[in-house]
């Protein structure tokens, strides 16, 4: 299906699996024991050590990693849509989002945290919120509650933490939106029998940005996909002066929230009417397309 070798999001280190299991258990609202809080604090310290050893990345390196990771995840989700029911696809997307937040977004944002006092509690709290966004802090371990007291009483701590957390969430949501948008495009192109193919990694970023190729009437057409949170189920399509099709796809990271899963399901498993409309729009643009 592809001639590229995309970067994979590695599996979570074992300590993150333990941390994830613990915060999920804490999220049930059960009383947090002293031993649980101690383990959680230890996990946060391990996380700090893990984050501190991540290399500093340039903006260009981050863009290239993001682009390759998106392609890797699109491939995985496309395969899942062939083999698994929607609940399993949605579950995998949420897992991908969490791994990306922990293994990519946290280290990037963490580069500016060197001057933060009590770093363990700081990251402890962020990990709890990242892994368990729907859980009230009243269910958090003691180390998190202690930090929340500082957060409420110290404006500097509050400002720094909010900036850091917002950076992590912004990076994650922007990337997840890209994954969803490109997956939705790929599914539509598949259903419309346009034979979508991945471009090379070198064309994923930069001035000659090409995400995919589609084939219609024996012509190979370059495509750039842009994800946005506007519009409807039918992407907008426009041909640019370079001959690329610019396809704008409606996608939202909020669709990973269980209460909004129906929107995600409709996007990943499009109706015949949606597919036919998409195919007609592509053909309309290609009627003006001249292969150089």
PLM feature segments, named:
Residues 1-4, 288-292:
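Intrinsic-disorder-driven secretion/translocation and chaperone-binding regions of pathogen effectors
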Residues 1-149:
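Nuclease-adjacent, charged terminal/linker segments that flank catalytic cores
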Residues 139-150, 154-174:
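Short basic alpha-helical hairpin corresponding to helix-turn-helix/winged-helix-like nucleic-acid-binding
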Residues 163-198:
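Acidic-basic catalytic patches of nuclease active cores, encompassing PD-(D/E)XK
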Residues 185, 189, 212-214, 221-227:
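Conserved catalytic cores of phosphodiester-cleaving nucleases, focusing on short active-site segments
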Residues 198-208, 215-217:
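Active-site metal-binding core of divalent-cation-utilizing nuclease and nuclease-like domains
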Residues 209-211, 234-235:
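A short acidic (Asp/Glu
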Residues 225-289:
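Catalytic cores of nucleic-acid endonucleases
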């Amino acid at each position: 299906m592809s001639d590229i070798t995309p970067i994979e999001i590695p599996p979570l280190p074992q300590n993150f699996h333990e941390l994830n299991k613990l915060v999920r258990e804490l999220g049930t609202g059960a009383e947090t024991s002293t031993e649980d809080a101690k383990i959680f604090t230890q996990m946060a310290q391990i996380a700090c050590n893990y984050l501190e050893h991540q290399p500093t990345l340039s903006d260009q390196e981050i863009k290239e990693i993001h682009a390759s990771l998106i392609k890797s995840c699109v491939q995985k989700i496309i395969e899942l849509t062939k083999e698994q029911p929607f609940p399993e696809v949605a579950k995998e997307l949420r897992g991908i989002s969490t791994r990306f937040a922990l293994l990519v977004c946290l280290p990037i944002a963490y580069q500016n945290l060197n001057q933060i006092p009590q770093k363990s509690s700081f990251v402890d709290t962020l990990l709890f919120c990242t892994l368990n966004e729907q859980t009230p802090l009243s269910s958090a371990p003691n180390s998190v509650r202690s930090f929340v007291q500082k957060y409420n009483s110290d404006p500097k701590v509050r400002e720094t933490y909010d900036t850091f957390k917002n950076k992590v969430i912004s990076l994650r949501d922007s990337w997840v939106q890209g994954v969803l948008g490109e997956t939705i495009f790929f599914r539509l192109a598949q259903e419309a029998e346009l034979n979508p193919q991945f471009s090379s990694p070198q064309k994923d970023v930069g001035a000659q940005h090409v995400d995919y190729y589609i084939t219609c009437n024996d012509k190979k057409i370059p495509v750039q996909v842009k994800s946005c949170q506007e519009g409807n189920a039918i992407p907008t399509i426009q041909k640019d002066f370079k001959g690329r099709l610019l396809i704008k796809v409606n996608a939202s990271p909020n669709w990973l929230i269980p209460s909004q899963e129906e929107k995600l399901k409709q996007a990943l498993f499009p109706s015949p009417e949606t597919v036919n409309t998409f195919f007609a729009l592509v053909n309309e643009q290609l009627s003006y397309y001249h292969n150089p």
